[in-house]
Amino acid sequence: MGFKGTTVIAIKKNGKTVVAADGQVLFGHTVLKSNAIKIRKLLNGKILAGFAGSTSDAITLFEKFEEKIKAKGDGLIDIKRAAVDLAKDWRSDKILHKLEAMMLVADSKNILLISGTGDVVEPEEDVISIGSGGNYAYSAALAYMENKKLSAFEVALRSLKIAARVCIYTNSNIVLEEIENE
């Protein structure tokens, strides 16, 4: 899937988890909005989620993901299980299968990528990025992660700024959300 017009990154470092995204929204070759918010806090801020792709599709997926977590009913939050359940539904459901988006979800312990092809990926490093500028942000973040003085917040911000400099579909209006790791 090649989505144009966004970059989203998730980072875990030094006891913090950050999900950040740029704010650009394109309609064809036109920038319609430069300050869109593409990340959400779910379950009273215990989970962060970001998306690349269609906004309405992403909102549907956020809702479905939250339903999967709540469906367990025991009060425990298991984003891995919820991600796998969502990916299964996304791939097999005739309506969900048509949704065009990718998601990053993170809690205090995990960072996951969920795609409509049924993929649920937990990165080897504590960094993952999606969207048109995803590879640029990811590469920058891997380099910045080696600097022990930089926080997760600073790594995410600097990485997205690099992506915005080289990806024409990414801008530098960056929104970041952060949670403390347990």
Swiss-Prot record:
Gene3D superfamilies registered for this protein in UniProt: Glutamine Phosphoribosylpyrophosphate, subunit 1, domain 1 (3.60.20.10)
GO cellular-component term (any)? HslUV protease complex
Q: Quote the EC number.
A: 3.4.25.2
Transmembrane regions: none
Q: Which residues bind Na(+)?
A: 164, 167, 170
Superkingdom classification of source: Bacteria
Active-site annotation: 6
* Residue ranges of coiled coil: none
Q: What CDD domains does the database record attribute to this sequence?
A: protease_HslV
Q: Which UniProt keywords apply?
A: Allosteric enzyme, Cytoplasm, Hydrolase, Metal-binding, Protease, Sodium, Threonine protease
Q: Name one GO biological process term.
A: proteolysis involved in protein catabolic process
Q: Does the keyword Coiled coil apply?
A: no
Question: How, per the record, is this protein's activity regulated?
Answer: Allosterically activated by HslU binding.
Q: Which PANTHER family match?
A: ATP-DEPENDENT PROTEASE SUBUNIT HSLV, METALLOPROTEASE TLDD
| Stated family | Belongs to the peptidase T1B family. HslV subfamily.
Which protein are we looking at?
A: ATP-dependent protease subunit HslV
